[in-house]
């Protein structure tokens, strides 16, 4: 037997109902916030992610699915959404559109070769938003508040918004120099990943998950000590907007994002619930990227966004025992007796469906009792039984499965009956 690839999953019909519910809710919220959907290819040039995500990141060095196509071009299955959206923004000259900033959202499969763990897959579904074309603390606050709104709309509680400022490029450069100076004498005691990051991306050392390295990081200088006046004021304005919006937050000066293109605002949305085992603590993350477009040969434009995993959202809902309203009414199940009635039901079904009536029938030649059980399993609102007598008299009893009451209807008027 051929099995599913490691790190992937089949989403079966009972689960796809939840997915459709979530995706519909997200679409509705994006309309409220005036964000438009964008769809980009599942694979892109490897160079896009090497430049846009960063050569020194774990994503590029360890996690990407990269291959040569038949034209000997290096292609990568997208590991994240921002770089592709920005590439599309540049390529399609969206900076020339009148409705600035451009507010976009996406939803689709991403691919990373990660260690299998709870809530993480090698193919996962990422939803994300990008607001490109406005460097304004109000936009940052809107995006952070939107992230909180999304999770609250599903009934999740125990949410904690963690924020930090990484500063502008000048502040980051000065801070990175201070980190190198701080860690260089003791870097030999750190894990191999941290050792390789010292001179390529020292801020990533702050995000190390190794316990002994975490302890050593506590004595490192903090980015807040190196923010210039511009960065300090921008961060203060973002926090003021969040206060005005009534969005609670916690500051963490060691919060950094795993990708190289972030500047100024960085944030994560977490579950702050003692019942969790820590596997799904972080639900969502993002931040501002003011140099990414130019890094990809685009115009001098700024952006901010975030991304979340649908799989981890579903896991969080399960952990908090939140049931999604995925039950949909099923209008009618047709029970048949005999070949002539069965043939008639096929045509009747077609007429009903073409008029928007959700209907089905039995195709396994079950007895009447078995067909009625199938109607129950489908949660049909109504059933009818068609046999020789019903065909001859052109009369049918429409049974309400909730009340048990029946109403006599002309068989040739059944479609109009359900269209009411």
UniProtKB/Swiss-Prot annotation:
Q: Which reaction does it catalyse?
A: tRNA(His) + L-histidine + ATP = L-histidyl-tRNA(His) + AMP + diphosphate + H(+)
- Say yes or no: keyword Protein biosynthesis present: yes
**UniProt superkingdom:** Bacteria
Question: What subcellular locations does the record give?
Answer: Cytoplasm
Matches recorded under PROSITE patterns: AA_TRNA_LIGASE_II (PS50862)
What general EC class does the enzyme of this chain belong to? Answer: ligase
Q: Which GO terms describe its biological process?
A: histidyl-tRNA aminoacylation
GO cellular-component term (any)? cytoplasm
- UniProt xrefs under InterPro entries: aa-tRNA-synth_II, aa-tRNA-synth_II/BPL/LPL, Anticodon-bd, Anticodon-bd_dom_sf, His-tRNA-ligase, HisRS-like_core, HisRS/HisZ, HisRS_anticodon
UniProt keywords (A-Z) are: Aminoacyl-tRNA synthetase, ATP-binding, Cytoplasm, Ligase, Nucleotide-binding, Protein biosynthesis
Q: A GO molecular function for this record?
A: ATP binding
EC number(s): the record gives 6.1.1.21
Q: Which family is this protein grouped under?
A: Belongs to the class-II aminoacyl-tRNA synthetase family.
* Quaternary structure note: Homodimer.
> What protein name applies here?
Histidine--tRNA ligase
Q: Which organism is it from?
A: Staphylococcus saprophyticus subsp. saprophyticus (strain ATCC 15305 / DSM 20229 / NCIMB 8711 / NCTC 7292 / S-41)
**Encoding gene, per UniProt annotation:** hisS
């Amino acid at each position: 037997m051929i099995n599913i690839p490691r790190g992937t999953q089949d989403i079966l019909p009972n689960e796809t109902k939840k997915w459709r519910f979530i995706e519909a809710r997200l679409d509705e919220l994006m309309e409220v916030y005036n964000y438009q959907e964008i769809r980009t290819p599942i694979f892109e040039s490897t160079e896009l992610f090497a430049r846009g995500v960063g050569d020194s990141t774990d994503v590029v060095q360890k996690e990407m699915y990269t291959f040569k196509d038949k034209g000997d071009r290096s292609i990568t299955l997208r590991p994240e959404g921002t770089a592709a959206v920005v590439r599309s923004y540049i390529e399609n000259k969206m900076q020339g559109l009148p409705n600035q900033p451009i507010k976009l959202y996406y939803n689709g499969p991403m691919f990373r070769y990660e260690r299998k763990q709870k809530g993480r897959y090698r193919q996962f579904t990422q939803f994300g938003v990008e607001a490109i074309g406005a460097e304004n603390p109000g936009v940052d606050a809107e995006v952070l508040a939107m992230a909180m709104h999304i999770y609250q709309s599903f009934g999740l509680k125990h949410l904690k918004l963690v924020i930090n400022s990484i500063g502008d490029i000048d502040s980051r450069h000065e801070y990175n120099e201070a980190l190198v100076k701080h860690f260089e004498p003791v870097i030999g005691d750190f894990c191999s990943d941290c050792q390789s990051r010292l001179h390529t991306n020292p801020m990533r050392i702050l995000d190390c998950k190794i316990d002994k390295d975490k302890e050593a990081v506590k004595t490192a200088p903090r980015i807040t000590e190196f923010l210039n006046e511009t960065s300090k004021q921008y961060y203060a304005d973002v926090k003021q907007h969040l206060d005005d919006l009534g969005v609670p937050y916690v500051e963490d000066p060691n919060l950094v994002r795993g990708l190289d293109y972030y500047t100024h605002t960085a944030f994560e949305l977490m579950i702050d619930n003692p019942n969790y085992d820590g596997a799904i603590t972080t639900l969502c993350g993002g931040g501002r990227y003011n140099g990414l477009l130019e890094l990809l040969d685009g115009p001098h434009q700024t952006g901010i966004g975030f991304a979340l995993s649908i799989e981890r959202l579903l896991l969080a809902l399960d952990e908090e025992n939140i049931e999604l309203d995925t039950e949909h009414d099923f209008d009618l199940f047709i029970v048949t007796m005999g070949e002539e009635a069965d043939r008639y039901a096929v045509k009747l079904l077609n007429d009903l469906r073409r008029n928007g009536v959700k209907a089905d029938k039995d195709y396994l030649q079950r007895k009447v009792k078995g067909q009625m059980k199938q109607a129950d399993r489908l949660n049909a609102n109504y059933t009818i039984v068609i046999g020789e007598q019903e065909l001859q008299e052109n009369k049918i009893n429409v049974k309400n499965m909730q009340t048990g009451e029946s109403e006599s209807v002309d068989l040739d008027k059944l479609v109009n009956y359900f269209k009411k």
